[in-house]
Amino acid sequence: MIESVLKASKIDKVLIATADGTDDSLSGDILDLQDCDSVTGIAILGDVTTTAVVTLKAYTGDEPALGDGAYETVTATVTADATSADNKLLVLDVIKPGKRYCRFDLVRATANAVVDGVIGLRYIFRTIPTTQGTDVVDSDINVN
């Protein structure tokens, strides 16, 4: 059997592009992890000003609106110099969080940072193949 990311995971855009800003927290959409064991958040950065601190955090809980939620201990963080964070990615992998729901939050501090979006990648599904949601407008698999 050929393994495929498209058939073994679900890909969602959980946070849309956001203009430059600082000293704020951007909350992504909540992902349901009922049928999978892990989720990865991928923050896509745009132009990031020197000294900006950008942190990707995972907020997890068992209630659909995350009323019981808490932040996971590990984060993905960058403190930018002149070009170190421009058009780069922050990636945070949450393996077996033990909670049903997860939201990725992006915190911007100190200086401006443009966010081109955050992707949520749910994987290790108990039942495959999976079907992609509406955020994926088209996909295909090439096997040679």
Regions inferred by a protein language model and the residue ranges of each:
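Surface-exposed, low-hydrophobicity beta-strand/loop segments enriched in small/polar/acidic residues
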Residues: 1-144
